[in-house]
């Protein structure tokens, strides 16, 4: 099923670059979300180095995306959570609501359109 989905994405003109070696999801991410991540998604994410649409504005998070951002312009895998925490500022109740939400919602896809 994973290979068929990758083939389908390629047929839709997505830029799908296989990983030279499998890139596992980091342990800190797995410890937070591992109980809820389907094995099929781990297989998909580990097989690819990149998976984005033609514009580069839509992408599936894959193994290398879970490494820390290298520059301020890079999107972190948990960028939406970070933005929410930044918006919450010193409001601890709001920050907890943001964290609680992201504790139960694992991001697999981002879009900047």
Predicted regions and their residues:
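A surface-exposed partner-binding patch
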Residues: 1-112
């Amino acid at each position: 099923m994973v290979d068929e989905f990758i083939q389908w994405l390629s047929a839709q003109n997505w830029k799908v670059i296989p990983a030279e070696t499998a890139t596992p999801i980091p342990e800190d991410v797995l410890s937070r979300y591992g109980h809820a991540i389907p094995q099929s998604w781990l297989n998909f994410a580990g097989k690819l180095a990149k998976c984005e649409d033609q514009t580069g504005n839509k992408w599936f998070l894959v193994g290398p995306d879970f490494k820390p951002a290298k520059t301020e312009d890079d999107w972190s895998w948990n960028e939406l959570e970070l933005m929410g925490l930044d918006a919450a500022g010193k409001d601890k109740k709001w920050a907890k609501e943001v964290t609680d939400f992201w504790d139960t919602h694992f991001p697999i896809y981002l879009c900047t359109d």
